[in-house]
A protein has these predicted regions:
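Non-catalytic alpha-helical scaffolds and adjoining flexible linkers that form interface surfaces
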Residues: 1-23, 28-202
Length: 202
């Protein structure tokens, strides 16, 4: 009896060189974080090789002996090469990818978290302000986890900072450009709160 096949569609958060022949892919999709092995391409092919932050559809063969599954077929649905053209956006995308790798293993209702990630990577691709993207993403992630981020962190800010944060968090990215320079201290404040008050690794 052959091993069962599974199909996923998600975003590549990490590629790790594990051997001469295989790469380890870490992919976050609507049903959570998945890891699988893909054979390295050794010859020219019309098939686009999956890369960091790409959105992919993958069919993989699950291993009956509890080992990592192997990719049987894949298709790159959306490449995000524009992220790498802006260093700040690339660094921001890497930060969010690490955050999901550290905290995305046992999430309930993973589809909500995938939507947050998907929207963030679209924004990075469009070269919006990285600290603002991260602030909104971490805030939404915390809310989706059921953490009191609004009641504890947001309401604990000074009146001026709270007003700025509220505007940035609840307005479209394009409308908060004028406040971009005010965002990094808020992002640092939220990151500190997450490290001190929650079990999330940030």
């Amino acid at each position: 009896m052959s091993d069962p096949e599974q199909f996923i569609r998600g975003i590549i958060l990490n590629l790790e060189d594990t051997s001469e022949n295989f790469l380890l892919l870490s992919i976050f999709c609507p049903n959570g974080l998945h890891r699988c092995l893909i054979r390295k391409l050794r010859k020219l092919t019309s098939l686009s090789s999956p890369d960091l932050f790409d959105e992919v559809e993958i069919t993989f063969q699950s291993s009956m002996n509890q080992g990592l599954p192997f990719v049987k077929e894949y298709q790159v649905i959306k490449k995000r090469i524009t992220i790498a053209k802006d260093r700040a956006c690339f660094d921001g995308a890497c930060f969010l990818a690490r955050f999901y790798l550290h905290n995305g293993e046992h999430l309930l209702e993973s589809a909500k978290f995938f939507q947050i990630l998907h929207k963030a990577f679209h924004s990075f691709s469009e070269h919006h302000h990285p600290p603002t993207i991260l602030l909104k993403s971490l805030f939404l992630f915390s809310q989706a986890e059921g953490l009191p981020v609004k009641e504890s962190w947001l309401f604990g800010l000074s009146k001026e900072s709270a007003n700025i944060a509220h505007y940035v968090l609840f307005k479209p990215l394009k409308d908060s450009v004028i406040l971009s320079e005010k965002v990094p201290p808020l992002l640092e404040s939220l990151s500190k709160w997450l490290r001190a008050e929650t079990e999330l690794r940030c």
